[in-house]
Regions:
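Short C-terminal boundary/hinge segments that cap the last helix of small helical domains
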Residues: 86-102
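DNA major-groove recognition helix of helix-turn-helix/homeodomain DNA-binding modules
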Residues: 57, 76-91
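The alpha-helix within a helix-turn-helix
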Residues: 42, 53, 82
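N-terminal flexible/basic segments that precede or flank functional cores
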Residues: 1-36, 99-107
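Short alpha-helical DNA-recognition segment
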Residues: 46-64
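Helix-turn-helix DNA-binding elements, focusing on the entry/boundary residues of the two helices
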Residues: 38, 49, 60, 75-78
């Protein structure tokens, strides 16, 4: 999706029209939301990318790409990330929308 397509879609949304979401846009948004949630939780724990990579059985460049929203991890990797980040990973996925959060485990 290029900028002019996004602008047209946004203008139509603001006008109250129903707008279909391109699957690429939805996937990119989910990847970005997931990356941001991982980054936020990692910083909250005071971990470096290398430390998180070690805990989750990844490499530091893989963590960097994921936090940047450049890749969507597999389900087994999501499980390892939740464990490495000491919490429960919550994914809420709906048509055209997603929400990703970590809920820390009780101490």
């Amino acid at each position: 999706m290029n900028h002019s397509m996004w602008r047209t879609r946004r203008t139509r949304q603001l006008a109250g029209e129903t707008v279909e979401y391109d699957q690429e846009y939805v996937d990119a948004r989910l990847a970005g939301d997931l990356g941001q949630a991982v980054y936020d939780r990692r910083i909250e724990l005071g971990l470096s990318q290398a430390e998180l990579a070690d805990r989750a059985g990844m490499t530091q460049p893989q963590v960097s790409r994921m936090e940047g929203g450049d890749t969507v991890p597999t389900l087994p990797l999501l499980r390892r990330l939740a464990k490495a980040l000491g919490g429960t990973l919550n994914l809420a996925i709906d048509e055209g929308d997603s929400r990703v959060t970590f809920t820390p485990h009780a101490a």
